[in-house]
Amino acid sequence: MPCLAFVNSWFTAPPYIRSRCFARGSEVVFYYIYFFFDFKFNTMSNTMSDKNSVNFTRREFLGTVAAAAAFTIVPRSVLGGPGYTAPSDMVNLAGIGVGSQGGGDIQNIATPDVPIKRRSFGGGGMLMQPYAGIQPPRRERRASDNPVQMGDAEKQSFKHANIYALCDVDHDYSGHILAGYPKAKKYTDFREMIDKEKEIDAVLIGTPDHTHAVIAAYAMKAGKHVFVEKPMAKTIYETRFLRDLAKQTGVVTQMGNQGHNIEGTMQTVEWIQGGVIGDVREVHLWTNRPMWRQGYFDRPAGVDIPSNLNYDVWLGPAPDKPYNPEMLHFAWRGLWDYGTGAMGDMGAHTFDAPIWALNLGMPTKIQATSTPYNKDYLPQSECVTYEFPARGNMPPVKVTWSDGGIKPARPAELEPNRQLREALYIGDKGLIMHGTHGAEPQL
């Protein structure tokens, strides 16, 4: 049995909430995008990219949790000069799931003590055949002999928190990050780390989607503050559970959604709410993903578990099924048991600006179509339309999501020399387009 079977007592959801049917899955993904933690904590930025922002002290972090709104930030100069923070004032941060996205987040919080060697974002699951008009990405890149090349703006070292501990189920896959922080304590089981390391103040969760909720809940129950990567959880029930638990425990929490606070996203919000393109009644969002296996495939046959992998902890609350390397390291996104597909991966980014700009609440209708799928893999391609009622002085609006090679129709008014971007807003006075993370909006 999976070692996290005990979580069944936490997440005893009605069967209809755990339904794997496509239409329900699309509705669930909308909740991934829409439900944020009630407590927003900006000391660990949503983009995790502002390397030169002012530091905050551990004493203040711990002393103002009960009044998070009154939290203050102390300039570096007060703590010992530019770029310096006393070690005793550093928040002790633990990273959980650091082989990929989580490792990038950690590096954006503190410069590695040892230069980190380059490794790909993807894993074995990125190796696939062309499908639905999508070309497979280049072969998996592995750790090279050369350190990551940084631009002049990135060469300055920084440390916004003390990387106190790092936890990953696969110390081979995450080895480049573990080696970069030799002083951090190393674990493969997040429960053991949280139980033993009482000095940990906060955790950063960058694991596969299916373990976000159980790890966040375990940390909050232990009094640890939580930053969890998007999607916050995998089901509606889990998001509500975490929301309520955050209130009960009083810890500060944040869901990471890279792009939410970049200039481009805010520019789009200002344009739309300022009426620059008039009333918006139609929005089209799309991505070229999945870049991993999705569709009508059989689950790969089980093979022996390698010694470097703590597979029980990787499974977490998921069904106890045989191991195969084609399910891990980025490829998990395409399986119902572990991921949320192309929409759950990129939709969280691309939906963000329209939800904010158009004050979207709950849809009144969802219509979805897809290519064939089965009990193991999400569909290769899908098209989902959400219908929202009028909101104040904003008219009803339809928001359509497409992936797996499906794109929206090109508007007649779009100039021939302009490419169709990943987000398209159609107003009665004009158009707005921007990229997946709200990047570079254009009128």
What residues fall within each predicted segment?
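Structural recognition of the beta-strand scaffold that forms the well-ordered cores
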Residues: 92-95, 164-168, 186, 204-205, ...
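N-terminal glycine-/serine-/threonine-rich beta1-alpha1-beta2 phosphate-ribose binding loop
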Residues: 32-224, 240-252
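A contiguous active-site-proximal alpha/beta segment in oxidoreductase catalytic domains
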Residues: 225-227, 232-308
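Contiguous beta-strand/loop segments that form the cofactor/metal-binding neighborhood of enzyme cores
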Residues: 65, 75, 79, 267, ...
